[in-house]
Amino acid sequence: MIIKEYQEFKPVQRALGLKADGLPGPKTLAAVALKLRCHEIWYAVQAAVNVAPDGIPGPATARGIAAALDIALPRSWPSQASVRAGLSIFGRPGDEGNLVSIAPPYPLYYEGRPVKTIRVHQAIAQDVKEALAEVLEVYGLDRIRALHLDQYGGSYNDRSTATGKSKSMHAWGIALDFDPERNSYSCKAPHAGLSRPECEEWWQIWEAHGAVSLGRERNYDWMHVQFARL
């Protein structure tokens, strides 16, 4: 069987203490079967979570497992491809009529200057506000400063990606950058600041709102978090 990557399996894998690669391989199967107390085959897992048993672990299977094990699945935002094709709720790139300004719940700084407001797409504004509020609650101001989570790199910017091949998610106002000085585009783990274990909760907070880290998913551009699936 060819194992495909599914975003829906990642929160399941994280909850089970596995590498969250989205690939429902043998380790994922073993951990799920142990939790569900069923035979270590996908047919048995699917039957245990009331999913039509075809033996192929796809999104429906992941959602069934999550429901059975009380694992919260994040909101599913549109894919990058649908955003760029103009088929998503985010509309056209560069449309500033879709943007709103929000006040960050803790002090942010852009190149040393205080940030009064952040401009993002109205569809993600509430999630951004809630995520940052949760960061403040979990880390507190002292740890936020120590980990440079108060260093803001921008959000809305009608531009192309670093490679210049397509529009950046920033052009829709659905991506934000943090601590760019220590998380440059080409910097990889473990050297990128936001790849450190101390930042695990930071990423868990964003991911709970359906946001995606390019660093965690592709190991580059660790500053970047976006509200669009890869």
Regions found by a protein language model. Give the residues of each.
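Second-shell loop/turn segments in exported
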Residues: 1-2, 18, 50-53, 113-122, ...
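Short acidic, glycine/serine/threonine-rich helix-capping segments at coil-helix boundaries
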Residues: 1-79, 213-221
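Catalytic cores and adjacent binding grooves of peptidoglycan-active enzymes
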Residues: 163-230
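Active-site-adjacent loop/helix surface patches within enzyme catalytic domains
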Residues: 132-174, 184-185, 212
